[in-house]
Amino acid sequence: MLRRLTTLVLPVIMLAASATAEAAAMDKCPAQGGTVRAAMAGSPPTLDFITSFAAQARDMGVYIYEGLVTVDGNYDVAPQLAERWTTSTDGKTYTFHLRKGVKFHDGSPVTAADVVASVERFRGQSPRKADLSMIASVQAVDEATVEIALAQPSAAFVPLLAYPGPAVAIMPKKLIDGVAAGKLPQTAVVGTGPYRLAEWVPDKHVHLERFAQYSPASAEASGYAGRRLACIDHIYFLPVPEVSSRVAGLESGDYDYAQNLPAETYKRLTATKGLKTVILKPYYEIVMHLNTQQGQLKEWKLRRAIQLGLNEEEIMLAAAGDKALYRLDPSLFFKEQYWHSTIGANRYNEHDAAKAKALVKDGGYDGSPIRIITSSDFQFMYNAALAMESQLRQLGFATKVQAYDYPTMIDIFRKKRADWDISYNAFSIRTDPGGFTFVLKSDSGYQPYASKEVDTLLEKALVERDRKARLKLYEQVQDNLYKDIPMIKHGDLFGFDALRERLDGFAPYYTTPRFWNVWSKDKR
């Protein structure tokens, strides 16, 4: 979920808006040719798109592979290899009709048999296979039609099918049959996307080249969906884990693009001639979990005192480092999504220290430290924890902060609940609110919080097919979270990347640099 860290700055916002409109309207490339050298925060552990949560696998996989469906600029479901689909009246059978004339990178046509093999492989080998556990069967009706039957209706099925990573990538049946998880050879890294793999040298580069036989969708470009044109001939994704090297290489011209840049360079790079800065939003929402089952915060009044007393503006500025790189927002879902809601907002960022201090006393606080765990891997998370700790001290709490690498922090959060009172985390965008079921449902064991009412709401929302009715259910979930206080959201963090001005048409989206529908003004 966090491995990308390994959506007043009007010029930036206007750049994104104009580039999006320009790219969406393109029927052909304004210019063809050239090379992009992109400095990435890390190297992909694999290019077998279905098997890894790693952001680097997604960032490169979306160029190579496509699915039946994907997500658009509003993070809603959009067709990709499927031109359309229908649903049976009982909501248990989905029939997908494939686009005609689509070819894999090896020149073979895409058939329903390839789709069946790919979906079945995902169900057997992907770490996200539980998301599609509602599937009962997958079968080819004919060469261009696939039928997927569900064991029970699920409103989340198609959105989860569209989720971009690990994605349900469609690959040639002949290349994936019998291949074990983690054993896909480089010669089998074959998809239908606008770029194909030319060479992968681990920890050195991933070289993608334009796929001349690519068959783009006819709809306007939006998010990962629509008409994706490969105007650049070659893309080199270069792992540059040292952030100072990414910045220096971008400024010197060694790199055309650099991702995941530090906030302290934002103003300078924005003002640098020949460069453009882009803000990625939404990116992550920063949250802290409160231990509702063990320790002092089992007492609701103490949790309420913390919720009541926090100054979220101060915490988010400390986390992001620049006012352009965050926003305050109370919703469990991002503003860019249909599911955004202000339910419970009256309990967000109240910043009432006097009432909070009174509740600390009334809640029977015994003076022992509130134990806060955070991650030293991610500066924003660490900085947020320190700013929040300072505020707790002002409210009358003693505190103790312990910083770990991210995997260790999550292990303590999940398995050693007697060892913490507050644990930090961050969530990226979910294409469907059903993605939060695992985080919130009592029987998942993800966090200490357990609520029969929330469990019932989540179960109803997973099968409710009316969108407005689902929204109301998730609003009730959000309302319960604000009342029960198992976690507190600080705000939305934005990402910050930069590129050279010779690249035109670029529009930020999600956490992935999109170089389709982008062209080089000098063709080099």
Regions found by a protein language model. Give the residues of each.
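Extracytoplasmic/peripheral linker and loop segments enriched in polar/acidic and small residues
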Residues: 27, 349, 395, 400-410, ...
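Surface-exposed binding/hinge segments that line
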Residues: 31, 130-176, 188-201, 502
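N-terminal lobe/hinge region of extracytoplasmic solute-binding protein
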Residues: 39-89, 120, 190
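Gly/Pro-rich hinge or "lid" segments in bacterial periplasmic/extracellular proteins
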Residues: 162-236, 244-245, 354, 358
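Structural transition elements
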Residues: 195, 324-362, 378-381
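Ligand/substrate-recognition segments at binding pockets and active sites
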Residues: 242-243, 326, 357-429, 443, ...
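Periplasmic-binding protein-like
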Residues: 293, 297-337, 383-384, 481-489
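Long beta-strand-rich cores associated with HINT superfamily self-processing modules
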Residues: 497-524
